[in-house]
Curated annotation (Swiss-Prot):
Cofactor: coenzyme F430
Binding site for coenzyme M: 346, 464
Organism, scientific name: Methanosarcina barkeri (strain Fusaro / DSM 804)
UniProt modified residues of type S-methylcysteine: 472
EC number: 2.8.4.1
Residue numbers bearing the 1-thioglycine modification: 465
Lineage: Archaea, Methanobacteriati, Methanobacteriota, Stenosarchaea group, Methanomicrobia
Residues holding coenzyme F430: 161
Protein's name in the database: Methyl-coenzyme M reductase subunit alpha
Amino acid sequence: MAADIFSKFKKDMEVKFAQEFGSNKQTGGDITDKTAKFLRLGPEQDPRKVEMIKAGKEIAEKRGIAFYNPMMHSGAPLGQRAITPYTISGTDIVCEPDDLHYVNNAAMQQMWDDIRRTCIVGLDMAHETLEKRLGKEVTPETINHYLEVLNHAMPGAAVVQEMMVETHPALVDDCYVKVFTGDDALADEIDKQFLIDINKEFSEEQAAQIKASIGKTSWQAIHIPTIVSRTTDGAQTSRWAAMQIGMSFISAYAMCAGEAAVADLSFAAKHAALVSMGEMLPARRARGPNEPGGLSFGHLSDIVQTSRVSEDPAKIALEVVGAGCMLYDQIWLGSYMSGGVGFTQYATAAYTDDILDNNTYYDVDYINDKYNGAATVGKDNKVKASLEVVKDIATESTLYGIETYEKFPTALEDHFGGSQRATVLAAAAGVACSLATGNANAGLSGWYLSMYLHKEAWGRLGFFGFDLQDQCGATNVLSYQGDEGLPDELRGPNYPNYAMNVGHQGGYAGIAQAAHSGRGDAFTVNPLLKVCFADDLLPFNFAEPRREFGRGAIREFVPAGERSLVIPAK
């Protein structure tokens, strides 16, 4: 496998630096060359830039105020260096750099939309209220009827109340509710259109793990309309869902809208039986639940679905790294906390051109050779986490990565920033340590050691302050203080020290995933999230985040939440 990935990495470098793209005149040369000319061809060398310049001029003329002009670049035109394409790692998709900015990429937007607009609400508490307080009978037939009512109401349609305005179905066609349960007997009675079938979506072993964790409980996987969460925020998801749940119970079970039991149903839907994707942030970051800063690394690992369709533990982790770098670096830190150009190329370093993949699969072979197959799927084959093991694997990984950059200067040109290289080197080391030990905090130790080795070798990591969290991170891997020493799976973008800067959080998420994909676990932290997103009806395919980003870049991805129906045709 490592040899195949190495060949693909070299092919990606050739596509990027030895073949002409647009009119950048990159034909010829070798990917190991140490020198090359900057031809200073300007932005017109790139097809997308030409399109953007044309659009910018037309818009400026139409609105009468200056707009996009790449000549406003510190007195020198954009495009002094060659503008080169990216290959999406793990795929053959080649795309324009600009098309990996999330504003230009509908798939990236939809990935976050699909997370933000989702919540999980338990059914059992509501059913107990109906049975014990109201004397209602709850059967598979009544549950199916309730779900039919709910799928009418959840997009914003009326029940119970007459003469209420409603949302147009064509604007909210991505909104629906399904249920799942660990009770096979109940699942058999649920109308299949409403069921996420654990036995169908997961392997036999994974399904057994998940059902053992969920037990006989039943849950609703709720996806409110994309257009709603875009207009409001992530905190609206549970409120929108709870309102429609309450009205649907009233309608389906012939309740009186004003009776006291409605308050219990509402409390269950809004609080007691609610599982949000992300936690509320403190006031200084002022974000409610279901916003990126509150999405833990373990939750993201469970949202990504690669573990359902692949038995390759390294690939499973790399897909989470890609998803995490896009969400945490490009959208969270790059816009929520910063803005504008954002931090796109911190993230692309981890999911393009197979540079991280090449390093990781080298590590897999190294671990399997030295530690008797410890990087293959299994629980009994793991090497015990220790400082010596972490030092060995992380050092080997980092030195290989550094040597690759030095042997292939094109990889250095690709990852032109020190912080990009630091992210990739440390992510490979951390994922490798996690795979070998089945211990995510050992993976964190590998990440931090990689940073120290990198700085020792090359004298610096990234921009000033990039390595703040890395300089103090090792001391907190096993701290007794809960806010410092959390397992990696429970940490997130708002964990102390992690909120400082880019180029880290996606790697931490991949490290969390690697510990569990290496063990063959069906989920990382929460089986409810793993099942909730095991659903082909979602617009974004969470089994292949990187490929979806590529489809968005080449304009093949079809998003939800569009307003074409209610605006003039162009």
